[in-house]
């Protein structure tokens, strides 16, 4: 039985004071949650205090990016070791916004995945297709490429520690929505690709999150699908009460 992992992605929102306030509320709200792993992805400037606030709770902290070197002359970058040293548990990688705005390639994302695993943290690898891919019938082709190139050369053991987050980029901010059944169909295809790479036993243990505008109103229907093992939540994670409603749907 796979355990649900529900992660919030705060993106470039919240200063340190706001982050501390929201996490304090979330920690209090979720103290009795037993069946869901809770993660918050916060901006770099908030991470150190975020880790301290949630210590001893069932909330873990994720970084939203990393550079795939332990140290060096890489001005402006943050290394996996720096994140690990302050107590970060997860790192969100390959998000559609980073692929779009910063032109991150699957090869570069794969380097980050390996660097995060090597230091003992858990990667959340984001994959997803655009509207033109969806309408052109290329969904599986695009996702399979992102998975195969993003997770190339991983051992089965490391694959099991890796979370895959499916973001239907075509459904974010376009007014188009994926039904729970459509999301399930794609998640099943993703698991089949993972099974090709790592074997069915490993694929059946891997967490596949849904990242297509999960909200309190649709969370229960999405999380009840067989191959949806949690969510990567954007806007609805910015307020503790709305994020908690999603967590309750999974719990």
Curated annotation (Swiss-Prot):
GO CC annotations on file: cytosol
GO MF annotations in UniProt: triose-phosphate isomerase activity
Annotated active site: 95, 167
Binding site for substrate: 9-11, 173, 213, 234-235
Pfam families: TIM
EC number: 5.3.1.1
Keywords recorded for this protein, A-Z: Cytoplasm, Gluconeogenesis, Glycolysis, Isomerase
NCBIfam families: tim (TIGR00419)
Name of the protein in its database record: Triosephosphate isomerase
Annotated organism of origin: Fusobacterium nucleatum subsp. nucleatum (strain ATCC 25586 / DSM 15643 / BCRC 10681 / CIP 101130 / JCM 8532 / KCTC 2640 / LMG 13131 / VPI 4355)
Lineage: Bacteria, Fusobacteriati, Fusobacteriota, Fusobacteriia, Fusobacteriales
Gene: tpiA
């Amino acid at each position: 039985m796979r355990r649900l992992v529900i992660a919030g992605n705060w993106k470039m929102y919240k200063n340190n004071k706001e982050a501390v306030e929201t996490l304090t509320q979330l920690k209090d709200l979720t103290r009795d949650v037993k069946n869901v792993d809770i993660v918050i992805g916060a901006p770099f400037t908030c991470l150190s205090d975020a880790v301290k606030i949630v210590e001893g709770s069932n909330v873990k902290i994720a970084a939203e990016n990393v550079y795939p070197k332990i140290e060096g002359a890489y001005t402006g970058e943050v290394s996996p070791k720096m994140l690990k040293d302050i107590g970060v548990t997860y790192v969100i990688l390959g998000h559609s916004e980073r692929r779009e705005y910063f032109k991150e390639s699957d090869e570069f994302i794969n380097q980050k995945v390996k660097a995060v695993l090597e230091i003992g943290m858990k990667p959340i690898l984001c994959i997803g297709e655009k509207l033109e891919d969806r309408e052109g019938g290329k969904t599986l082709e695009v996702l399979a490429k992102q998975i195969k190139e993003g997770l190339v050369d991983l051992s089965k053991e490391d694959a099991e520690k890796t979370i895959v987050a499916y973001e239907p980029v075509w459904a974010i901010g376009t007014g188009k929505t994926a039904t729970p059944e459509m999301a399930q169909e794609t998640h099943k295809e993703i698991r089949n690709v993972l099974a090709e790479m790592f074997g069915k036993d490993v694929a059946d243990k891997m967490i596949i999150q849904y990242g297509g505008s999960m909200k309190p109103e649709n969370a229960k229907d999405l999380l009840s699908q067989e191959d949806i093992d949690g969510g990567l939540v954007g806007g609805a994670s910015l307020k503790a009460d709305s994020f908690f409603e999603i967590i309750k749907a999974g719990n």
